[in-house]
């Protein structure tokens, strides 16, 4: 699989002040139908993924350990890169313009911070459908952390099967997560939160962290405002519903 990081290209719509891409040039609808037949270039198996094209500075023994599923415009992914410079984190986004924005954003951050302590060489984004192709990218027990932040709630009952958390997909997540690995979920929709907690706690390979454990995690405070969607919820004085689960 050839992955294009676009670092050598001129960034379309980049701000003359910051050098970073501007979201107004990458607007797209809030969600995309995960069941529709989108056209994706995906690997046949994890061994075929050209990770070095995404992480030029990665070591020979390094693997991607963090996955931000439905990473949106990449705000939380950037935060992960800053918090864990020694870890490789991937953002997976189904919307073409949004994934283009994140790819361009990372390229601009790498260029701008080439001589800084944080170079953003440890984060990358790919356009894919994680509901279909996750096992094509990751080996068994490869991931340490997975993030599902403000996923599409699919309000209509007939579309609940499209929700990113369901019993069938949880078995795939358990496959790519190592034992002791964590799944972080955050939403501003209480009904979806209830759905997530119900399905995760019913699955035999996941257990929910206690409030004390969740609050002690250094990532937890970042879940509320690091992503663009989370920041919007804060601006609108909405509620956040957090649940973190451990792979057992």
From Swiss-Prot:
User: What residues form the catalytic site here?
Assistant: 152
Q: What Pfam families does the record point to?
A: Methyltransf_4
What pathway is this protein said to act in by its record? tRNA modification; N(7)-methylguanine-tRNA biosynthesis
Instruction: Tell me what reaction this enzyme catalyses.
Output: guanosine(46) in tRNA + S-adenosyl-L-methionine = N(7)-methylguanosine(46) in tRNA + S-adenosyl-L-homocysteine
Record InterPro entries: SAM-dependent_MTases_sf, Trm8_euk, tRNA_(Gua-N-7)_MeTrfase_Trmb
- Cellular component annotations (GO), alphabetically ordered: nucleus; tRNA methyltransferase complex
| Top class in the EC scheme | transferase
Per the annotation, which location comes first and is thus the protein's main one? Answer: nucleus
Q: What highest taxon heads this organism's lineage?
A: Eukaryota
Q: Describe the family membership recorded for this protein in Swiss-Prot or TrEMBL.
A: Belongs to the class I-like SAM-binding methyltransferase superfamily. TrmB family.
What's this protein's name?
tRNA (guanine-N(7)-)-methyltransferase
């Amino acid at each position: 699989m050839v992955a294009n990081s676009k670092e050598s290209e001129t960034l379309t719509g980049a701000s003359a002040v910051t050098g970073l891409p501007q979201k107004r040039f990458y607007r797209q609808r809030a969600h995309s139908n995960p069941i529709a037949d989108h056209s994706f270039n995906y690997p046949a198996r994890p061994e075929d993924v050209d990770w070095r094209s995404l992480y030029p500075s990665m070591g020979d023994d390094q693997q991607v350990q963090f996955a931000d599923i439905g990473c949106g415009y990449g705000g939380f992914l950037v935060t992960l890169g800053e918090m864990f410079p020694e870890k490789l984190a991937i953002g997976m986004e189904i919307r073409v313009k949004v994934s283009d924005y994140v790819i361009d954003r990372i390229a601009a951050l790498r260029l701008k911070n080439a001589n800084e302590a944080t170079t953003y060489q440890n984060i990358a984004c790919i356009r894919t459908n994680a509901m279909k192709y996750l096992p094509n990218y990751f080996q068994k027990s490869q991931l340490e952390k997975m993030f599902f932040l403000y996923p599409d709630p699919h309000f209509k009952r007939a579309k609940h099967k499209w929700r990113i958390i369901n019993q069938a997909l949880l078995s795939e997540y358990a496959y790519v997560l190592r034992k002791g690995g964590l799944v972080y979920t955050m939403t501003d929709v209480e009904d979806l939160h209830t759905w997530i907690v119900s399905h995760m706690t019913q699955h035999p390979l996941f257990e929910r962290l206690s409030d004390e454990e969740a609050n002690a995690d250094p990532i937890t405070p970042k879940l509320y405002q690091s992503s663009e969607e989370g920041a919007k919820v804060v601006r609108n004085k909405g509620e956040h519903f957090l649940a973190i689960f451990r792979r057992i």
